[in-house]
Amino acid sequence: PSNSSAASDVYKRQEEDYYDAIHKSFDIDNTDEVVIEPFIKGREFACGILAGKALPLVEIVPKDGLFDYANKYQAGGASEICPPISLDAETQELIQRAGERAFEALRMDVYSRADFIVSDADGEFYCLEMNALPGMTAASLLPKAAKAAGYEYSELCEAIIQESMKARY
């Protein structure tokens, strides 16, 4: 469905399963819209953005298959490596700049998170989504990226409050 979050209704299907998967998606929340995307096999990275500037990337390595709802919220479902060691500095920089441009183009406000995948097939990176309100628990991806940039959790929260005040007053 087009209105789900946290990959709770993300499915990877074989071509013969498309019809059933599409109909199942329409049944969730009685929606009349679904999003169908090609599957890109690759490595996933999260790019936190604070005040329009990219934080260090976080590489997400799911224990099993996709970084779906179960792998996101199940203890041990994924490893999160920040900063990533499997990606060269130039590609990290390109992804960070793309995250900043998406933040600006979508007129995001104060903080967000851009999720990317680097294709195993061709090494190109693709933006999967922008999260306008990314998770903010101490274990969430944005606070992990901020910690790698030198922010303690309380300092990140304070920075978000200060930037929010600047944007409004």
Positions of PLM-derived features:
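Conserved metal-phosphate-binding beta-hairpin within the catalytic cores
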Residues: P38, F103-M136, A146
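Short beta-strand-to-turn element immediately C-terminal to the catalytic PLP-Schiff-base lysine
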Residues: K12-Q14, I49-A51, S119, L128, ...
